[in-house]
A protein has these predicted regions:
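Nuclease catalytic cores that cleave nucleic-acid phosphodiester bonds
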Residues: 2-163
Length: 163
């Protein structure tokens, strides 16, 4: 799928917002620190109650426990200029098509050029699991991932602010 880098008819949000697919996100504390330093609003979306810092820039959004409810909420709320943090490839694809920047919790950016192969690989792995093949999960989260994420989030916010 070829996704546009921006949506020309919709102006980007300025300043950008950060939307977080938060249920299994290992970098929430880092997101809060960066957001407060840069004065950027954050929406922390989950299907369970999560603790978030009490600050006007940080909003907790608790959705129903229905399958993909958090993903659906984020996909409907996101727009050009926003930055989304998620490990969910299908949500990343939806957010990219809405004109947002998307990065994974390890700092890997999802782009219009990379999302197609990520979706295809996800489908292959799902087929292998259904077929009973034992495949490993993601690599353990490391301190280097945290550093890479912080750098990627800063870069995404700088780019979003320039749009």
């Amino acid at each position: 799928m070829n996704l546009p880098p921006t949506l020309p008819n919709i102006p980007p949000r300025n300043p950008p917002r950060i939307l977080v697919d938060a249920d299994a996100c290992p970098v929430k504390e880092e997101i809060y620190r960066v957001a407060l330093r840069r004065a950027v609003a954050v929406r922390v979306v989950s299907n369970a109650h999560l603790r978030v810092p009490a600050h006007a820039l940080i909003e907790r959004v608790v959705v129903s426990g229905a399958f993909d409810a958090a993903d659906d909420w984020i996909a409907e709320a996101v727009g050009p200029g926003d930055v989304v943090v998620t490990a969910d490839i299908l949500l990343a694809e939806r957010c990219l098509s809405a004109g947002a920047a998307v990065i994974g919790p390890t700092g890997k950016p999802f782009t219009g050029g990379s999302i197609g192969s990520a979706v295809a690989m996800r489908a292959i792995m799902a087929d292998l699991r259904v077929g009973g093949d034992v495949i490993g999960g993601p690599a353990p989260f490391r301190p280097a991932d945290r550093s890479r994420f912080l750098q990627a989030l800063d870069e995404a916010l700088v780019r979003a602010g320039r749009r």
